[in-house]
């Protein structure tokens, strides 16, 4: 029975496209309460980092994050695997190593059979096993739409933690996955994505960002984040604002997934692309329609955005090659300039 079910038809959003826009989220997070300060909380939500980081002594820190969303693909196992991979990415993006995870499941038990939920959980468990950790438990509720994700605990040496606020002018910018996930998954939700492209985007979303843990010990690695629902420009703007730098991006060097261009021409643009653009358009130089479609595209389980000092570029390229990870040079960071946009796109 579950083989004929299209999960994407049971949700109004898809993957990280479910995220609230950066502009609206800023309003939600405002508070009139006095802020409780814990000196052991090394990273909170002030700099839009990927996870919280807490000092536990002896030079070590616990990394804590959660991420969940509605179906981005139709297959339950693949949905669970992608959602789990996406949640684990926050730990890797901070430079940490995951320790364990617990599942978060919302499920319309009156609309879908329990075996579908079982396959979703199984996909999540598989991704955790690939990352070398256990899915230790979780919590489930009856919901109107399927929702799945993880709360993940990780660990890292404090000196290896990569913050959005630690990037420096002169750093080169690299991406570890091509863009276009939001475009292809929008085509899938509309029933227009070819089978080869379904497999291509699924495999990309299921790739763990373990390279983050391997790169973290390099002192020349100044900042790192994963590209998810706010698109490349949104997550890059978070680094630029937190670190008081500006960026120049070569849009022709930004790799896109094979086939994305044809789906852009067909109008397979997620609604979140425009919401993203409106949230940070004032920070970015003017964009062409194509640049907006690609650079503001909502990624689910996207790659890492890496800022690295020039003298270590060869090192990170060697590490990427050793583990078979993609690595694309897309731009550079500079000192702020009053006559320049926060992000210049060429």
Curated annotation (Swiss-Prot):
Cofactors named for this entry: Mg(2+)
Catalytic reaction equation(s): hydrogenselenide + ATP + H2O = selenophosphate + AMP + phosphate + 2 H(+)
Enzyme class: transferase
Gene Ontology annotations for the cellular component aspect, listed alphabetically: cytoplasm
A GO MF term: selenide, water dikinase activity
Catalytic residues in the record: 16
InterPro entries xrefs: PurM-like_C_dom (IPR010918), PurM-like_C_sf (IPR036676), PurM-like_N (IPR016188), PurM-like_N_sf (IPR036921), SelD_I (IPR023061), SPS/SelD (IPR004536)
NADP as UniProt keyword: no
Important for catalytic activity, annotated site positions: 19
Gene Ontology BP annotations: selenocysteine biosynthetic process
Subunit structure: Homodimer.
Family indicated by similarity: Belongs to the selenophosphate synthase 1 family. Class I subfamily.
Described function: Synthesizes selenophosphate from selenide and ATP.
Protein name: Selenide, water dikinase
Gene for this chain: selD
